[in-house]
Structures are given as structure tokens and as C-alpha cells.
């Protein structure tokens, strides 16, 4: 293991120890308050696994049954509490996602300071590591992000098998994986024969997604459900346009995602030169990240305030690792200044001290 890799893992270890020691650890009931209806749905799927759920579940949640169902089977085989098992898998997934990102950045020969900054930006984001440790039932989000990172890496390596593996993982976790297929189609239409995917591969990607979706549809069609599927999907796409909200309410709604993306924006001002949108080669990879991230962030916005609410922060953060990778590998960086470097780390530590997801309470008065 070379010096840069050792340093990266040492920094990751230090950051994670700090988070593990200072994080909130909600019990089941608390996690439902701060994690929303998704967690209850996933728990019920696990509870009744290997059989079908007897409790009503929202169809859109039931379609993501695969991993909660698998966790339920594992919990019964090894006699481990479902909630505890989810938290164990959250720890594992956080480490795995970090490993993928470190290995990916090392391929680009990224300066050690910027690898450290990337680990800080990822893990001190209160809506990434802290959130999922505190609310472990929303594990499907982490699995989705892992799958998207695998797809990003596959495009860099031009590895089709790896891409389909990542797509399957993401599709089993969330219907949002459709964004991966659309992004690939977009690249193919733009680049035509200059893209290593042919139209058959694009068709296969949509077929894979559709097959996984139909598995979820089959599960959700054989259990009691809350609400109707058509109504949920209609609101998912058109919710924002059928709401009657004041300008102030909508303004606050659109500001919420900045609670997750704030440090990344500040990083851009502090460490990236003026040619912000300069793309260094890897056109396919960069187009994919841009289209994918746009679709992922746009979807919870379309749902509207009544459905998404503060969940817009969590749902928009599904694109956070992809955007982080884009900003680390592309724009030309400013020369590292020790004061600026330490100032930013301090800022991220403060930003990470979320009064809900950490043991720190000094930011309680600025919650909104």
C-alpha cells in the first residue's frame, strides 16, 4: 500500500471514529420520527420475511422490498435483531462507499490534500454518515449510492459487466435507478458510435431495470397497501404543480438541500479556480454524472413540499457522492493554503455537529 493510500485510510479511520463517538443512535421509535415512513415500511418487510408482509405498506416502498427482505432472512438465521442488523450493515456500507471513492480518486492521481477534503466533505455531511447511522432503517439509500458509484467507476474503466452490476444494485434499492438508464441513453444519443455502449447495451440496461421493477411490483401487488400506486406516482411526478404553497414556503423548501450541499459549495469557492466548469477528458463519465445528478435532485423537487417535506434534503443527497467525485476530478484546483485548508476542516466539523444527528447541541438555535 503506497503512502497516499495509507494516508487516505488513516484519515478515513480518524473521521469515522470521531463520528461514531459523537453520533446520535436513535432507537426504533425515534428513527421513525426522523427517518419518515420509508423506515417503517422496510422494517415491516424484514419482520415478515421470508413471507409476505401482512401490514399495509405504501406501494412505492414495497417495490423496494429486496434488501429489507434479505435482511429479514439473515436476522432470523443468525438470531440478530432487525434494527441492530440494519445498523451493522450501515457501518459496512459506509466503509465500502468510502473505499470505492478513495480507490477511484487514486486512479486520477488526485493530490493527497484533496483526497482528505473529499473524505471530510463526504463523511462530515450530516445527511450522509451521521444520518444513516442514526436512522439505519433507510439503508436502501446507501445501497443505491453504492450502486451509482460502481456505475461511475465502470464508465471510467469502460467495463460493461461492472456497470450492469452497479445498475442491478441500484435498481433493487430504489426506482431512482431509472436515472442511470436515462443518463446512458443520453450519452449514446449525443456520442453515437464514440460511446463504448451500443444501443443493444442501452436496451439491456432498461430491460434490467424493468425486470427488477417488475419483481418489486409483484411483491407489492400481493400485500396490503396504503393508498394507490397510480396516485403515488402521479404525485411523485407532478406534486409540485398541484400544491398551493406560498412563496415563503417554497423558498424554504428550495433552501433545505443546501443544508447538505453547503460545504460542497463553499469548497468550490475556496479550492477551485475560476474555470469552474472545465472538464478534463473523460467526457462520457462527466456527462453521466451531470445528467444523473440532475435527475436525482430534480425528482424530489417535483414531488413537492407536501410529499417530500424535509426529506428533500435526504433525497437530493442521493446524488452527493457523484457530484463530489465530479468536483474533485475535474476543475483545476487552487494551490493548497494551510490557513484555508484548516479553516475549511473546522467549518465542516461545525457543519457536522447537527443537533439532531450528533451529540452536540450548540447549533440548536439555528435549526429551521
Residue ranges: model-predicted function:
Residues 21-22, 197-275, 289-297:
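Membrane-lumen/periplasm interface segments of specific transmembrane helices
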Residues 3, 180-207, 277-279:
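Perimembrane helix-loop-helix junctions
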Residues 6-35, 207-220, 296-298, 345-354:
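Transmembrane signal-anchor helices characteristic of membrane glycosylation enzymes that use polyprenol
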Residues 148-149, 161-175, 180-186, 207-211:
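Membrane-interface alpha helices of multi-pass inner-membrane proteins
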Residues 88-109:
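Transmembrane-helix motifs of polytopic, lipid-linked glycan transferases
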Residues 39-47, 57-80:
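Short hydrophobic/aromatic helix or loop-helix immediately within or flanking a transmembrane segment
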Residues 140-162, 166, 322-326:
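Specific aromatic-rich, kink-prone transmembrane helix
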Residues 65, 83, 87, 94, ...:
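Aromatic- and kink-enriched transmembrane "portal" helix at the membrane-lumen/periplasm boundary
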Amino acid at each position: 500500500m503506497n503512502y497516499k493510500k495509507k494516508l487516505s485510510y488513516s484519515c478515513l479511520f480518524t473521521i469515522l471514529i470521531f463520528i461514531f463517538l459523537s453520533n446520535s443512535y436513535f432507537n426504533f421509535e425515534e428513527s421513525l420520527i426522523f427517518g419518515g415512513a420509508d423506515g417503517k415500511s422496510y422494517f415491516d418487510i424484514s419482520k415478515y420475511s421470508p413471507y409476505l408482509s401482512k401490514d399495509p405498506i405504501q406501494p412505492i416502498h414495497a417495490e423496494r422490498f429486496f434488501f429489507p427482505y434479505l435482511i429479514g432472512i439473515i436476522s432470523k438465521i443468525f438470531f440478530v435483531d432487525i434494527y441492530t442488523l440494519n445498523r451493522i450493515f450501515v457501518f459496512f456500507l459506509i466503509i465500502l462507499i468510502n473505499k470505492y471513492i478513495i480507490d477511484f480518486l487514486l486512479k486520477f492521481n488526485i493530490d493527497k490534500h484533496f483526497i482528505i477534503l473529499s473524505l471530510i466533505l463526504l463523511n462530515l455531511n450530516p445527511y450522509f454518515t451521521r444520518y444513516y447511522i442514526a436512522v439505519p432503517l433507510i439503508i436502501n439509500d446507501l445501497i443505491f449510492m453504492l450502486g451509482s458509484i460502481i456505475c461511475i467507476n465502470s464508465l471510467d474503466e469502460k467495463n460493461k459487466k461492472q456497470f450492469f452490476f452497479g445498475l442491478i444494485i441500484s435498481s433493487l434499492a430504489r426506482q431512482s435507478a431509472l436515472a442511470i438508464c436515462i443518463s446512458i441513453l443520453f450519452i449514446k444519443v449525443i456520442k453515437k458510435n464514440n460511446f463504448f455502449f451500443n444501443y443493444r447495451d442501452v436496451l439491456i440496461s432498461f430491460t434490467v431495470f424493468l425486470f427488477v421493477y417488475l419483481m418489486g411490483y409483484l411483491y407489492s401487488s400481493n400485500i396490503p397497501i396504503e393508498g394507490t400506486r397510480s396516485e403515488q406516482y402521479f404525485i411523485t411526478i407532478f406534486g409540485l404543480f398541484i400544491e398551493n404553497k406560498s412563496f415563503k414556503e417554497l423558498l424554504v423548501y428550495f433552501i433545505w438541500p443546501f443544508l447538505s450541499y453547503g460545504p460542497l459549495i463553499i469548497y468550490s469557492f475556496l479550492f477551485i479556480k475560476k474555470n469552474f466548469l472545465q472538464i478534463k477528458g473523460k467526457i462520457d463519465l462527466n456527462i453521466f454524472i451531470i445528467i444523473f445528478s440532475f435527475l436525482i435532485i430534480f425528482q424530489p423537487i417535483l414531488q413537492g413540499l407536501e410529499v417530500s417535506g424535509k426529506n428533500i434534503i435526504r433525497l437530493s443527497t442521493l446524488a452527493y457522492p457523484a457530484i463530489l467525485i465530479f468536483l474533485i476530478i475535474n476543475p483545476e484546483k487552487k494551490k493548497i493554503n494551510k490557513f484555508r485548508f484548516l479553516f475549511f476542516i473546522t467549518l465542516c466539523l461545525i457543519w457536522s455537529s447537527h443537533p439532531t444527528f450528533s451529540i452536540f447541541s450548540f447549533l440548536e438555535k439555528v435549526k429551521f
